[in-house]
Curated annotation (Swiss-Prot):
It catalyses: dUTP + H2O = dUMP + diphosphate + H(+). GO terms for molecular function: dUTP diphosphatase activity; magnesium ion binding. Substrate binds at residues 69-71, 82, 86-88, 96. InterPro entries: dUTPase, dUTPase-like, dUTPase-like_sf, dUTPase_trimeric. This is Deoxyuridine 5'-triphosphate nucleotidohydrolase. Belongs to the dUTPase family. Its cofactor is Mg(2+). This enzyme is involved in nucleotide metabolism: it produces dUMP, the immediate precursor of thymidine nucleotides and it decreases the intracellular concentration of dUTP so that uracil cannot be incorporated into DNA. Pfam families: dUTPase. It comes from Neisseria meningitidis serogroup A / serotype 4A (strain DSM 15465 / Z2491). One of its GO terms (biological process) is dUTP catabolic process. SUPFAM superfamilies: dUTPase-like.
């Protein structure tokens, strides 16, 4: 499935590094830090990184999800400050990435470094129907850990 997404380059330095799929099977597109200079994230610190780009999905049956890059998280403890970013179809502002250094070492974010990935996902908008009781299920109200460890 392919959709067309409108993209604005808000900072001309990003014109040559717009998001592209790295391989035919890639699900995510890398977003880069649109910075004038390096930013050092101290342990436990968060920083809102501009990307210099804006997108407009327009179609409410799609959204964009921002996710951490696996290498940054695993090797350096750098994840998203909000864990997952959600870009609604009607948002038209600059894409910004909240980076969080959850490691015990400072981490330097360099200008134009790949900092997150963006995945376009289908959305279902639910209509809720109020009921007094649910039809029974085998799980019922069993929650946290109720299905066992393995």
């Amino acid at each position: 499935m392919n959709i067309e997404v409108e993209m604005k380059v808000l900072d001309e330095r990003m014109a040559d590094v717009v998001p592209v799929y790295a391989t035919k099977g890639s699900a995510g597109l890398d977003l880069r830090a649109c910075l004038d200079e390096e930013v050092v994230l101290q342990p436990g610190e968060t920083f809102l990184v501009p990307t210099g780009l804006a997108i407009y999905l327009a179609d409410p049956s799609y959204a964009a999800v921002l996710l951490p890059r696996s290498g940054l998280g695993h090797k350096h403890g750098i994840v998203l400050g909000n864990l997952v970013g959600l870009i609604d179809s009607d948002y038209q502002g600059e894409l910004k990435v909240s980076l969080w250094n959850r490691s015990s070492e400072p981490f330097t974010v360099k200008p134009f470094e790949r900092i997150a990935q963006m995945v376009i996902v289908p959305i279902v908008q639910a209509r809720f129907k109020r009921v007094e009781e649910f039809v029974g299920s085998s799980r019922g109200e069993g929650g946290f850990g109720s299905t066992g460890l393995h």
